[in-house]
Every structure is written in C-alpha cells, then in structure tokens.
Amino acid sequence: MDNPTTPIAVVGPTASGKSALGVSLAHHLNGEVVNVDSMQLYKGMDIGTAKLTLEEREGIVHHLLDVWDISETASVARYQSQAIAVVEDIQRRGKTPILVGGSMLYVQSLVDDWQFPPTDPSVRAKWESKLNEVGVEALHALLAQKDPQAASIIELKDPRRTVRALEVIELTGKPFNASQPPKNAPPRWNTQIIGLGTNTEWLNPRIDLRTELMFEKGFVHEVENLVGKGLIADSTAGHAIGYAQVLQHFAGELSVDEMIEHTKIGTRRYVRRQRSWFKRDPRIHWIDASGDTFSMALSLLS
C-alpha cells in the first residue's frame, strides 16, 4: 500500500475466519484491530460471539471490545463516533487500522459517511404501541410490505430495529435504506475492503462445529452469569443469536438439543443476510475463505 495508515476492512459472514486474518494482517502491517462486530462490543459476551481470547490476539491491540454494559441498548450512531475516533488515533500514530467484523450496519457506518436520519419520540411511541398490540412478527410483516429491502436485513424477531425502520420511513417518506450512503462512493479514508467469500458446503459445517464447541466451552454458564448482571430477553444483547436461544431454554421454551439446533439455524439465517448485504457492495475485493486468505489478502494490497 502507498499509505501505511490507510485502513483495511475484513468483512464477510460469520465463521469465515475474519478474526484470524485480522490478527495476521496486523502483525504484517504494524496494525491495530478495530472491532466491527456489534455483539463483541458487550462486556462478558465472549464465548457466544467467538471473541478472541488474549492469547488468540497474539499481542495485537484490539479496540472496541467490551465497551458496553450488558443492559445497554446498542446504537450504530454511538458506535460510529467512537470507532471514527479510534481509527483516526491509530492513523495519527502511524499505524494501520484493521477493521474486522460482519455486522452490516456497523461496517457501513464506519466505511461510509452515513448521516443518521432523525428521530421523533411521538412517531416511535406510535410504532411501539403497534408492536405491543400485534407483536414483532406481524410488525415485521408490515415493514416487509412497506420496505422489503429493509425487512430482508432486519431479524424477524428484532423489535427495536423493526420499530426504528418504520419510524424512519414515516419521518422521511422514503425507504429505510435511502438514508444510507450509496455503496459506489469512495469509502471513508479510502479504506481497502476485503471480503471472505464462502459457499454453503464449506461454511455450514464450520457453523455447526463452532456452535457445538461454544456449548462445550461453557456457553450456557456464560449466559447464566450475564443474567445475573442484567441480561434479559427483551434487550439488544438478549436478541443475539445463541444468547436468545439459551434464554429460551432457561424459560423452559427449548430443550437442550433444540437450543443448540436453533442456534445453528439462526446463524445460518444470519449468514444469508450477510451475504446478501455484502454482495451488493462493488467496492469489496473478494477472496476465497477456504484458501490461504493471508497470502491472497497481501496480493490484493500490494
């Protein structure tokens, strides 16, 4: 790269190897990693988010891990301001920011100049009342009628984002995604975006294995501890894949086997949304996640 402080973003679906590649690139390029996974922002959400341990970070500085309390509501706008400050501090110190994660809105908030649409408490209250009246799935179906593209990237059982999308649509008179910047504009800081491409035959077994290992490593105990610190089902963290299923198990709604299987299913569903989102961005340089991703990434960057 001509400019050693130009950020590199490593994006792609869950379980594709982003975190390991980020560490390797940081070693090679004198870089520091900036987390772009919304659930890894939460303190104590470790096993279920595949957060790298200190040993796995191999001495590389990782920013924006463990910054939010478990009861806090996630905010892309708040993340954006924090992350921009971190990236620009890394650049001032002459190092390469390595942005790593697959949380779609968070990635775009960082690499694009995304100005967030307005809020209106009365409009939001109206949609929250509608949510309480009909339930999240019916409200999500209404969103799908108004804005199919927004519905395709918002989890079926995510009441907060469903309400927010409907609020934005009403306030702006435009689709929710119209508030996002076009994906053909130059990315902020001229960030180089590398995508880990996967196929279902390769990725699904990795998802299954990773899920099973999560539970073997004490994931249920992790969630139990977080409940003691304020984790509830009706919260941002409580809607996270895996955590939601364990909470359903605690509530007697899922057996152990169902809890594990539903976590796998939820992860595969999320991966489909990630693929759909990222493939629409022509600025992403794709490499094969099943190959030597480090060598391929360096070739792209040279």
From Swiss-Prot:
One GO process term, biological-process aspect: tRNA modification
Residue numbers binding substrate: 14-19
Annotated site, Interaction with substrate tRNA, chain positions: 103, 124
Keywords, in A-Z order: ATP-binding, Magnesium, Nucleotide-binding, Transferase, tRNA processing
EC number in record: 2.5.1.75
Binding positions (ATP): 12-19
Enzyme class: transferase
Reactions accelerated catalytically: adenosine(37) in tRNA + dimethylallyl diphosphate = N(6)-dimethylallyladenosine(37) in tRNA + diphosphate
Protein task: Catalyzes the transfer of a dimethylallyl group onto the adenine at position 37 in tRNAs that read codons beginning with uridine, leading to the formation of N6-(dimethylallyl)adenosine (i(6)A).
Record HAMAP family: IPP_trans (MF_00185)
Family listed: Belongs to the IPP transferase family.
Protein name: tRNA dimethylallyltransferase
Organism of derivation: Corynebacterium diphtheriae (strain ATCC 700971 / NCTC 13129 / Biotype gravis)
